[in-house]
């Protein structure tokens, strides 16, 4: 899934109880919060949220944050 967050926008903290998620940053800057740790993200960065964990994504820059997310479903 491709997503775009405007400056200051966030995808709030949410759990991944039955799957994991990989986020790849295409453009812009932001930060992810995972397991209580903030991680800065920019173009080319990748974030992995394992199954059973929670995370959030926030655009901290002046431009849109464009990303690609993969959420594999387990059978």
Language-model segments: residues:
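A cytosolic small-molecule/anion-sensing beta-strand core signal
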Residues: 1, 26-27, 42-43
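A short glycine-rich, His/Asp/Glu-containing loop-to-beta-strand
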Residues: 1-13, 19, 70-75
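Short, surface-exposed secondary-structure edge patches
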Residues: 2, 22, 37-40
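A generic "binding-loop/recognition-motif" signal
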Residues: 7, 18, 37, 53, ...
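Histidine-centered metal-chelating micro-motifs
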Residues: 10-12, 31, 47, 51-56
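Glycine- and acidic-residue-biased ligand/ion/polar-headgroup-sensing regions
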Residues: 18-30
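Short acidic-glycine-tyrosine-enriched beta hairpin
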Residues: 36-51
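Ligand-binding loop in jelly-roll beta-barrel domains
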Residues: 51-75
